[in-house]
């Protein structure tokens, strides 16, 4: 991308890579070092939802880019948890024109293996009570000149191999067609065994 003069902003998921694993004080529990997204449920409070930790950094960075630069389009790509973030964030911010989720999520009815259940953010009932994955896929794809592509690794060593994705691809495409704008596509890569 850089060779083609694209500007690239790279981010990592909470608690991963350059992000720290803080020690937090939780009422009634004491100090806990956060090492896993599964612990984020412990941070839930009346005035704070840990889901913000996944999407707010994207919003802050996108707002900065929009203020400081004159880009015509914004694209977003994410792998695994970043693929999940790509689905959710592009569903709520129409500034994302092209979104590519790689091994990032699957509808709940396809999660029949423990390895596909996902972390806190993947199964947070407060979010999915209001909007399910199929609706998130529609929202990610819907809009003028907007595209959402799901990419699955057929022989994925981790999760979300894309098996069963054909059961909903036509549903999403049909809904996008009814709405009259947007594009949705699924691509299953069978060329490797990696995540």
Residue ranges and their predicted role:
Residues 19-24, 88-89, 110-113, 161-163:
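Short, solvent-exposed loop/turn and secondary-structure capping segments
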Residues 59-120:
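Primarily recognizes the serine-hydrolase "nucleophile elbow" in alpha/beta-hydrolase
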Residues 14-18, 81-83, 105-108, 154-158:
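Solvent-exposed loop/turn segments at secondary-structure junctions
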Residues 54-63, 135-142:
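Structured alpha-helical segments in the cores of large, soluble enzyme domains
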């Amino acid at each position: 991308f850089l060779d083609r003069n694209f500007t690239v902003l790279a981010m990592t998921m909470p608690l991963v890579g350059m992000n720290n694993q803080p020690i937090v004080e939780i009422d009634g529990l004491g100090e806990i070092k956060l090492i896993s997204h599964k612990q984020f449920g412990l941070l839930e409070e009346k005035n704070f939802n840990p889901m913000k930790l996944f999407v707010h950094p994207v919003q802050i960075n996108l707002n900065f880019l929009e203020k400081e630069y004159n880009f015509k389009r914004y694209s977003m790509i994410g792998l695994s948890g970043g693929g999940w973030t790509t689905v959710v964030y592009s569903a709520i911010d129409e500034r994302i024109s092209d979104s590519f989720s790689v091994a990032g999520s699957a509808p709940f009815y396809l999660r029949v293996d423990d390895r596909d259940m996902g972390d806190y953010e993947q199964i947070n009932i407060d979010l999915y009570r209001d909007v399910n994955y199929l609706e998130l896929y529609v929202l990610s794809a819907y809009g003028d000149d907007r595209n959402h592509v799901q990419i699955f690794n057929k022989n994925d060593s981790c999760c979300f191999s894309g098996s069963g994705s054909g059961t909903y691809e036509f549903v999403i495409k049909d809904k996008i067609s009814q709405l009259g704008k947007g594009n949705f596509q699924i691509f299953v890569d069978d060329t490797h065994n990696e995540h």
